[in-house]
Amino acid sequence: MGNICINDLDDYVILVDGKIKSCLYDLRNKKLYHINHRLSKLIQKVKDIPTTYLSLDEINIIQDLNNNGIDLSNIVTIEELRKSVSLSKNQIQFAWIEVCTTCNLRCIHCYNESSSMCKNEMSYDDFGIAVKVLKNMNVNKIQFIGGEPLVLGNKLKDMITYASDKFESIEVFTNGTLINDEWVQFFDKYNIKVALSVYSYIDSEHEKVTKVKGSYNKTKQAIEKLRKRNIKYRVCNTIMKDINIGNKNTDLFTLSTKKDIVRMSGRGNLNLLDEKLIKKKLITKDYFSHPLNKSVIKSSLFFNNCFGSKIYIATDLTVYPCVMERRFSHGNMKENTNFKLDDAIMKLNKDKINGCKDCEFRLGCFDCRPDSLTGEICSKPWYCTYLPEIGEWELVENSLERIK
């Protein structure tokens, strides 16, 4: 194989061996095939041999692969691929910038454990340092987060104004309760996108999460203002035990009933999950019956699927790999004038994870390191039910018992 760009992998079928079994990742058709080691070895043996040298059984196996749309000449082992793929110098594409830890709400699951008692703020000068470093890294998308960024008032406006011509995309993540007409005009002027958190279509259920009465109506009114002004916005929700999402009763937003089940970070903990949600969260055989996520596979070849393309800058300019991951950091921008990211953090993919590095599914399995029940950085996801050491899936009831 010659040098190929990581974005030009769509015609390949990647062969990944595990401890007992193997997987074929058919990127063109977005399909995954779980096979035994015997077939894996046979594929590696015959893929470059003329059929005249093969046995009838071997020819029949090749024909079966062809019938499933797999061309033997397109199969490449993960080891071969890693030797041939050329990477662009820049990997980080997005940065969260935490401008404060103060929040006017008290959300029960807050990954940042923010509240009105938290008083950390990023100074304007430090923000300038962060922007300079991000520009040097060719980062083109940023998101202002908190806490609640809008509690900063004019200070946040000054930061946004300064950054407005330096990035392709700027978004503010907010609970929406402080958005008024003045903020909407400001967002419109500087082409700022807005992400908002809403937890239910029912005001009382939403406020079970935020712990502040009246917060639902304020957020909903903010969304109405944003839409009226044609501001680009999106609504995010986290799914938790005992929080009834309710029935859709507005055309302002749509809440997910499946994605983003609460993670074990910050105030997020097992007490916010019931058996039904844990079952939804489990990685089971059915997880791989859906079309393959090619972006996850491509990023996981060399990098952690998140840490390789995103960073999180805290108020004191410490740089973490994720908004939820503070067990380790890349260092501090302020303390290092020649700041560089830690390559080992960016490349913390499933090849380095206990219980995953010998798993044939590791290339197509999305990894969220912060979503952990232990302090161990390299622990296997607690919600995974596959046992690569024996090549079998754990019974769901056994998984539930283990987690409890």
Q: What feature does the model see in each segment?
A:
Residues 2-4, 12-17, 188-320, 324-330:
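Radical SAM enzyme [4Fe-4S]-AdoMet core and its adjacent flexible, acidic
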Residues 42, 46-57:
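Short acidic, hydrophobic short linear motifs in intrinsically disordered regions
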Residues 56-57, 64, 68-185, 189-193:
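Conserved alpha-helical substructure of the radical SAM core
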Residues 324-404:
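Flexible mid-to-C-terminal extensions adjoining Fe-S/redox cofactors in radical SAM and related proteins
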